[in-house]
Amino acid sequence: MARKPGRAAWAATMVAGVLALAACGGGGPTDVPTRTVPATVEADKGAPPSPAAPTAWPLTGVPSDDVATRPALAVKIENLPQARPQAGLDAADIVWEEVVEGGITRFVAVYHSKTPETVGPIRSVRPMDPAIVAPMHGILAYTGAQKPFIEAVGAAGIQSIIMDKGDDGFYKQKGKRAPHNVFGRTSDFWAQADDDRTSPPPAQFAYASSEGQGTATTAGAPVALLDVRLSASSRAQWSWGADEGAFLRSEGTKPAVSPDGDRLSAANVVVLSVEMTNTKFKDPAGAFVPETQMVGTGEGVVASAGKQVAVTWSKDGVEAPLVLTGPDGGRVLLEQGATWIELVPRGSGSYTVS
């Protein structure tokens, strides 16, 4: 009786048949169609990482692990003798001194790290103020101005808080005569910050990471006095106070003080030679309103820690920060602390360093 082939024999026969067919196929490899399957990429639907928290106050460079998220607050402050001593100048992070009509000066005082209760006397805005304040994307408080000047503030991305428009925070101080009697409460000004102003300002200058490492301190020459003549009628002096570790301000030769009698001082004094031109606009007395040309370039000096160094300044646009460059072509590092900036008109103003 013949036996039926088993499964193993059947499988061997099938394999042999397949090999035989392959041998008859012309000897070339058999093309096997392929299909590309695109990879599936899962989108990261999580929130973007939060920016790193600041480790220093942006307008002073002073280290801190608790930098407030409030915006920068700039306030126009008067500097006539009737306005002195002004409230709040001693608490400002940065103060700009500018020449206005008649050769008098006014301040743009900028607050962020400190919150003085009261500031003033407050006065009106001027054509150069947008270029000073715009890089901080903050608030500018002032009493009023001609319409084109106010429009320029808004066009620069700055929020205006204006007494003449009924905004909160302004009051008239008893015992002072107009127009030297308008003061303001910083808490009320900050409370009106709009939804675009919920972050601290960007740094306006570069600061040394530790004390004594500023550019003037490490590479400058000793300085005892900066004598700044802004006009025929306005003169500021800054003398180095070794005991105080700061430059001390005088109006002319008279010490400048706060309402409490404390001397006004600065860790850094920046003196810049700037172009000043007359606008087509006039003040109520008929004098042309001047404008300091903030966009451009020029020379100057930076003084820190009893030393001074020559610098070049440049500013590319209204909303661009002012850049200070040292003799080596590198960016100037300021010492940590308050900075005062003197805008000295070329030709009509001057300064000496001794």
Predicted regions located by residue number:
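Post-signal peptide N-terminal segment of mature Sec-exported envelope proteins
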Residues: 33-52
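Bacterial signal peptide processing site
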Residues: 25-28
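Bacterial N-terminal signal peptides that target proteins for export
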Residues: 1-13
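C-terminal motif of bacterial Sec signal peptides marking the signal peptidase cleavage site
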Residues: 20-23
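A surface/extracellular/periplasmic glyco- and lipid-processing/surface-interacting theme
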Residues: 35, 53-92, 101-110, 115-354
